Amino acid sequence: SAEAPALAGVHLFCAAILYARLIGPDEVSESLRKKIVAELGNQKAAQPDYAGFMGILALYYLGDFVSINRIIPRYRHDTQPADQPCPVIAARLVLQSFSNKASHEASKNVMAFYRENDGFAALHHAPAADLLSTAVALFALHFIDADIRIIKPACLSFVDKLYQHGGFVATHDDTQPDIEYT
């Protein structure tokens, strides 16, 4: 019997997503699925909504909709703390969509991080956009079928400008490509 590698947290979730997309269902994907369900059951993450988003997204790609339906009630929040970063607010939007609670107001909360003719910033008061926030925000907005036609050209241009020397940098001020962004 195949066993999933000894991974946890975001590493487990990302490995499961990649494995599901590249390999598909088999004994390893089943082992990954079981580990994710167990990990989401004892979630003690600093950002539980973001960890839940990543875990549920992994289950989505693994095709485990039964576990998603069982787990999603833990993430049904009607309030959104104002001090949360863009990736967490965007993650919450995706989680809400699984329980049919995504709203126009929730997508406006994500759009509040958009910087005109650029991308999305991590925090409301951050002066510049960054690649991670832009990617997560665009993913969340696309996931709920929000109309992103107006911001799409600027965001694509922003991402394109972050590709330097064979890899991606996090922001315009970054000079060194990072494997995390590539």
State each model region's role.
Residues A38-A45, P73-P81, M111-R115, G119, ...:
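HEAT/HEAT-like alpha-solenoid repeats
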Residues A102-E116, P153-H165, V169:
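Glycan-recognition and catalytic cores of secretory/periplasmic carbohydrate-active enzymes
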